[in-house]
Curated annotation (Swiss-Prot):
Biased composition (Basic and acidic residues): 208-228
GO CC terms of this entry: extracellular region
Record's signal peptide: 1-16
Compartments where found: Secreted
Disulfide-bond pairs as recorded: C154-C170
Keyword Secreted: yes
Chain intervals for the UniProt region annotation (Disordered): 191-250
Keywords: Disulfide bond, Glycoprotein, Secreted, Serine protease homolog, Signal
Stretches of the chain forming a coiled coil according to its record: none
Residues in Peptidase S1 domain copies: 124-408
Annotated glycan sites: N90
Name of the molecule in the record: Inactive serine protease 35
Amino acid sequence: MENMLLWLIFFTPGWTLIDGSEMEWDFMWHLRKVPRIVSERTFHLTSPAFEADAKMMVNTVCGIECQKELPTPSLSELEDYLSYETVFENGTRTLTRVKVQDLVLEPTQNITTKGVSVRRKRQVYGTDSRFSILDKRFLTNFPFSTAVKLSTGCSGILISPQHVLTAAHCVHDGKDYVKGSKKLRVGLLKMRNKSGGKKRRGSKRSRREASGGDQREGTREHLRERAKGGRRRKKSGRGQRIAEGRPSFQWTRVKNTHIPKGWARGGMGDATLDYDYALLELKRAHKKKYMELGISPTIKKMPGGMIHFSGFDNDRADQLVYRFCSVSDESNDLLYQYCDAESGSTGSGVYLRLKDPDKKNWKRKIIAVYSGHQWVDVHGVQKDYNVAVRITPLKYAQICLWIHGNDANCAYG
């Protein structure tokens, strides 16, 4: 049943009917020239305290409805939000100021678009539509193999051989870095092998025999000890066979973390939900296939208005959970959606599958970061939504700068 469902999810053609009419047939990735973000100057800051409590929800934030009433940010404001902090594994911290070039400010910055009308409820809506990925044929292969788990309790996604994209609130509460983020680790799923990761015992014996053998060789006591050792090995072997085939995590330390100043405000105001994303650089590269970053299209350019993401929901211990759902509302920076999700899945990479215009095949790219279940200000009233932070051209340029260290490879996205 699971295999049939996943086949339908991943191989259904990219057309659908919504509200009785066919959506626009332009489901392709369109490369566009993006603004340049250039590092201007880097300052050393005092080391953070690492004392904040990890939060799965942000306190009251300005959501889509609230954004409609805001003026378009000026260039200097955007440069302030896109400047970024870097915290290193030894606890040191820097602030990098940036300049934005080749940006055309549009007067319709905060226009919003309605998607499919959906009944609003909390994190899980009626019948739970999440799917635990248990079959190792899917679990260890793309796209599911790109999902990772953070030691702070969130999820993330591989976007390069050495980088993970996640939500900023998973490592920083807007004022300070969360407890445990100084020694942050990322867990990559792998399958246990037959030996359980232990070395064979025969090597020690062969070395002993090569050096002249054991003085007790041939005695009754020695034979009895060898028999007991054999029984112990048989018992441990049974335990290894039980563990064989189950997924486990291979944990890797994080070398440094980048967070935009739009989120890491310190004492200079509240964190902005639009900038709830962070990039983690791993100490060592992985060998898995990663998912490329893309720029979020409008709802009309999403097949069926649907998005997909996988993460490690807390109510399903160490299971990778996949879901897909419709986007209900969008602004330039946020997506409201009603995917069933629990805490632990925040930080997951939200992706689409569109046509690659050059190769004419379908390709998945990350177009948002799942920020989680958030309380937002709607005309002075607090309402709860599931929110994802969109990858805009500016954010694409910033994350690309973080990955490559310069903007040479970030002209198009």
